[in-house]
Amino acid sequence: MKLFGFGSRRGQTAQGSIDHVYTGSGYRIRDSELQKIHRAAVKGDAAEVERCLARRSGELDALDKQHRTALHLACASGHVQVVTLLVNRKCQIDVCDKENRTPLIQAVHCQEEACAVILLEHGANPNLKDIYGNTALHYAVYSESTSLAEKLLSHGAHIEALDKDNNTPLLFAIICKKEKMVEFLLKKKASSHAVDRLRRSALMLAVYYDSPGIVNILLKQNIDVFAQDMCGRDAEDYAISHHLTKIQQQILEHKKKILKKEKSDVGSSDESAVSIFHELRVDSLPASDDKDLNVATKQCVPEKVSEPLPGSSHEKGNRIVNGQGEGPPAKHPSLKPSTEVEDPAVKGAVQRKNVQTLRAEQALPVASEEEQQRHERSEKKQPQVKEGNNTNKSEKIQLSENICDSTSSAAAGRLTQQRKIGKTYPQQFPKKLKEEHDRCTLKQENEEKTNVNMLYKKNREELERKEKQYKKEVEAKQLEPTVQSLEMKSKTARNTPNWDFHNHEEMKGLMDENCILKADIAILRQEICTMKNDNLEKENKYLKDIKIVKETNAALEKYIKLNEEMITETAFRYQQELNDLKAENTRLNAELLKEKESKKRLEADIESYQSRLAAAISKHSESVKTERNLKLALERTQDVSVQVEMSSAISKVKDENEFLTEQLSETQIKFNALKDKFRKTRDSLRKKSLALETVQNNLSQTQQQTQEMKEMYQNAEAKVNNSTGKWNCVEERICHLQRENAWLVQQLDDVHQKEDHKEIVTNIQRGFIESGKKDFVLEEKSKKLMNECDHLKESLFQYEREKTEVVVSIKEDKYFQTSRKKI
């Protein structure tokens, strides 16, 4: 099996989940999966590829077991000659492999620019996606190859292509922290207003992945700083929640610049509107009334026009102009200015002039009695309105503070409860799952805190808006008595019969002022109505939000109670289990002591039997020596009587030998029985020691057990040494018997030569047969001892393996204990 890797350059990303898709470029190739043309394409042998195509033209688009063509493999390995050959033979350019990647995607993935250019020139589609939703442009962004990206865009690659996470190449470059690619894509007019699945803008992602350079680039592009994601958070909130002070300062400075520009634009539009209004009023009135007009415009117009309405900073200019000029034309659509003006401030001033003339015409035929009644009603209602407004404001402020306090206290309660759960509930999850769970809970808590702070800020801003609106209402109501007093003066002047020309001029000025004030009051009333409607809608929305927050708080309290009950139950259950384990530990310790005592007894018995066996062996060796001496004496003496005595002595020696062999067999039987007992006890000891190991792992008492295992290991080594000594003794005895057999064979040869000593020959033959039997018995014993030695070696090997396992388990327990203490 051969493995080939292509394009080993790797990029550094901010997310670990991206790496497994974009790094490790190239195919994992096995010879068994390839045909001849595929092997030639991998090697870059263009001549071999031509030969394969000449033999079989159908192999041009042949697929291997991974659905790859020769073009895929040639592009991945960067063999330009093979790619040009296959493309000129008109192979399929947009074939997909198992990962739905085309040869173009694979060439860009492996950063083989020459192959990618050839494919693009021959009509490869750059907008096809793989199983991850990535186009060739996404891979070019990841490898930070601007030349490849430029060629893809010049051949019709879609600059706003989306992957599975709805990331455009620009957003993907921001996620991977590729500043060069961000600048390049923005130069190529990539949309900076694109958002991902969570409606996060490019600026939010740059803040989230802590890349101040990209933030600076985006702010220079005049990106929308006030854009919000699904949770209602903007880029500044992301910087605050991730403690990125530098990026937060950048965003704040940019916001200040925007606000300064808007204020300057609003001020200029206000001044132009006031000047246009003043000129229009001067043109419509006679020359004698200029002074009164200047006074009226100073008192009324600048205060109402220049004061900005509450709202977000990027909507202030529009609201100021529209608020002053939208009200009256809605009621009187037939009234239109004679000239169309492009500036919105000028339009507002023209509309205001038309409204004032209309109000002046309507106000002339009004009866004096109705005006007096209105004046009295307004004087009665004014203190009540002030008190009602103040009470409403105080109630709303208290309500918003209560909401923020309840949400913050609920979040803090949830934080402390989750921390308690993390401390007192450690054994429910494994370590890794617990760490991931703690990280997720901390992130959720931080997000909830930021959301609560944002809600609190929004509520404060809205309350400040409402205060400004109520102040406007009070100012409007304060202007009403002045208007009514002016009307009363004009009526009294009309009722007096002796009024002169000067009084007529004063009355004219008062009437003009009255018309202006009425128009202002009408505009203010309309604004107040719209504001009241907006306030009612917002109040309803806030009431709904309060209900939702209360429901969530109730659900969280229930969840906390359930968690507390579960924790108490689990703690009680684990306490019971711990007590049971302690009792079992004591019981196992007692059993282990008993087993140790029985083991000592068995060892003492074995030692006694070994001493007996040694004595029997020594007796046997002495009998062999006596037999040898007797045989030598038999050779020397040829006397019949001596031979008879020797034969009797030999028979006695044989009887003794038989008796000793019987004793030896009995001792061996006992020895085998003791060995069986020892094995059984050893097996039981092993089982109980394993059980004790599991208990002591839970109670961190494995060190004592390691010492016991060391002692057992030393005892087993001593036994092995004893068995090896026995084996050496047996081998020596076998050699000795073989020598005796050789000597007896020589004697037999000598005796056969002598015809007179037939009886001696028969006796010697019998002795030879018996010695052969003894040799056979001793060989069987030696085989048994060898088997026992092998068995003991296997047991030693098992003990060593168990010892290593115990050491590993001890280390793991220590590591888990230290990690738990740290947590």
From Swiss-Prot:
Residues 431-480, 565-724, 776-806 form a coiled coil. Residues 301-343, 356-405 are annotated as: Disordered. Residues 371-384 have a biased composition (Basic and acidic residues). It comes from the Eukaryota. SMART domains: ANK (SM00248). Keywords: ANK repeat, Coiled coil, Repeat. ANK repeats lie at residues 66-95, 99-128, 132-161, 165-194, 198-227. This is Putative ankyrin repeat domain-containing protein 20A4. It comes from Homo sapiens (Human). The gene is ANKRD20A4P.
